[in-house]
Amino acid sequence: HTFWNSSSETAHSFYVGSYGRGTAINTSDLDVLIELPDDEFSHFSSIYGNGQSRLLQSVKNALLLTYPNTNIKGDGQVVVVKFSDGMKFEILPAFRNNTIWGWDGTYKYPDTHMGGDWMTTNPKAEQEAMKEKNSSSNGLLFDACKHVRYVRDNNFSSYHLSGILVDAFLYDAIGGWHFLREGEQHSGGRVHGLKMKTK
């Protein structure tokens, strides 16, 4: 509302992270990319001394207008919103990367570490790639990502293995798998259960 003078809650935002990729489980944070107007980028990128941190504070203050009794703080690249019911949102403020040919599909977002910088992401391409590989693996990619998250959260939470790392590893690993027919052999002998092999 503050940045676009709009009453829409979805016109300039979409899910990213594990929810956007389709690999979230019930313990996952909700990551939301909020697209901000270009003139805001011009303003914050011209600020001397970590304009990225000032941007996160500005987004935090805008959220506090709507949720004044909620725990909201800037954290590196996002604004973290923790509700009393346990729901946790990570808000990523971002700007379209426009070239002389128009928008290239990527976004720049703030990183407040080391004095501040701008990073680039392409979440829609990432989401499409995940959907395509999940489809070609008959749903195995999303199921495997969710299962590894469950095991991580219940047995190895001290390792702090990020969701993007889980997804990237499994995305790459599943690329070399293919399904076997019942009774078909692979070089290591009979496959039980999953009926798949690596190339």
Over which residues does each language-model region extend?
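Helical scaffold of the NTase/Pol beta-like nucleotidyltransferase catalytic core
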Residues: H1-F14, C145
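Metal-dependent nucleotidyltransferase catalytic core
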Residues: H1-S6, I34-V81
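Amphipathic, interaction-prone secondary-structure segments
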Residues: S18-T23, I91-P93
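Short coil-to-beta-strand
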Residues: N26-E35
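A short acidic/basic microdomain associated with nuclease active sites
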Residues: T10-G17, T70-K73
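Short, solvent-exposed loop/turn and secondary-structure capping segments
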Residues: I25-N26, H43-S46, G102-W103
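Catalytic cores of NTP-dependent nucleotidyl/adenyl transfer enzymes across multiple folds
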Residues: K60, Y67-T198
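Short glycine-biased active-site loop of nucleotidyltransferases that positions the nucleotide triphosphate
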Residues: R21-T27, K82
